[in-house]
């Protein structure tokens, strides 16, 4: 009993160790995939927020009158780090694109703020003499998106069987079969009717007187030879038909029929699935890109 328990425990422990060895790499790969997906999502989110922030700043600059840019007082003390993108691949576009469309309609008015303290009256400003060219957008293309053809749909179901073909020409007559074995002799027929009695013969001459014998009677003689066979009787009535014999063996299989006609073509396949999203490249931090442009 103890040997059985030890063997069972050892087998269970071995199975558990093997399960752990096969499960840990799978969990590690799953965690790495989730980590990569999270990093990709964060990168996409940062790119979208940078683009939105840049568009908001451009709209604000377009709507509000141009003012003198604010100078960073620490530029004279600390040297600004130079941004370079020469180490990135050619397909990476890390700098935010500048919008070329006019600003949208103004948003709803916000909540009124608290009244501030009245400021001192400023000097009279100069008349504005600068003019700006109107902003125009590139024409929007109305062409349809040309997608690649989807994969072929599954094959349609088989069509119904075609109608049976016409009967063929009649075959040549077969050869005459061999004679069968002679039948068993029939049962003997019934006895025939008795014949008519013959005519009486003429009376014979009277015999001579015999002598009285004196001896004892002798032994009986041997039986005589059999007489000739009598005439054959009439044929008997035909016997009843015998019981049917057992069924013969099955004949050979017939020739295969002609192939049926092809079925109707299947329905066209559905539209293909959309392609995977394009991969994003790692971009520098938003603050450095924004400061380099503004």
UniProtKB/Swiss-Prot annotation:
Compositional bias segments (type: Pro residues): 100-112
The keyword Transmembrane appears for this protein: no
Residues in the signal sequence: 1-30
Residue span, Collagen-like domain: 218-276
Assigned GO CC terms: collagen trimer
Family statement: Belongs to the cuticular collagen family.
Record function comment: Nematode cuticles are composed largely of collagen-like proteins. The cuticle functions both as an exoskeleton and as a barrier to protect the worm from its environment.
Subunit structure as annotated in this protein's UniProt entry: Collagen polypeptide chains are complexed within the cuticle by disulfide bonds and other types of covalent cross-links.
Entry protein name: Putative cuticle collagen 145
Gene behind the chain: col-145
């Amino acid at each position: 009993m103890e040997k059985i328990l030890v063997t069972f425990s050892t087998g269970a422990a071995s199975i558990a160790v093997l399960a752990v060895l096969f499960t840990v790499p799978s969990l590690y790969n799953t965690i790495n995939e989730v980590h990569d997906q999270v990093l990709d999502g964060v990168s996409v989110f940062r790119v979208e927020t940078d683009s939105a922030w840049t568009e908001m700043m451009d709209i604000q600059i377009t709507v509000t009158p141009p003012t003198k840019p604010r100078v960073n007082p620490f530029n004279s003390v600390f040297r600004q780090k130079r941004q370079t993108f020469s180490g990135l691949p050619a397909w990476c576009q890390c700098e935010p694109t500048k919008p070329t469309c006019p600003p949208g309609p103004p948003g709803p008015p916000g909540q009124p703020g608290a009244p501030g303290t009245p400021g001192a009256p400023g000097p009279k400003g100069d008349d504005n003499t600068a003019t700006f060219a109107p902003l125009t957008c590139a024409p929007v293309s109305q062409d349809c998106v040309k997608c690649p053809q989807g994969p072929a749909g599954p094959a349609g179901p088989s069509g119904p069987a075609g109608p049976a073909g016409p009967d063929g020409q009649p075959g040549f007559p077969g050869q005459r079969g061999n004679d069968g074995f002679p039948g068993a002799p029939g049962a003997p027929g019934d006895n025939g009717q008795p014949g008519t009695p013959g005519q009486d013969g003429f009376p014979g001459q009277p015999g001579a007187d015999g002598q009285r014998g004196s001896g004892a009677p002798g032994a009986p003689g041997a039986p005589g030879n059999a007489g000739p066979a009598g005439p054959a009787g009439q044929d008997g009535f035909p016997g009843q038909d015998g019981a049917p014999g057992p069924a013969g063996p099955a004949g050979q299989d017939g020739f295969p029929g002609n192939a049926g006609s092809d079925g109707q073509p299947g329905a066209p396949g559905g539209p293909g699935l959309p392609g995977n999203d394009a991969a994003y490249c790692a971009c520098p931090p938003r603050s450095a890109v924004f400061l380099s442009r503004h």
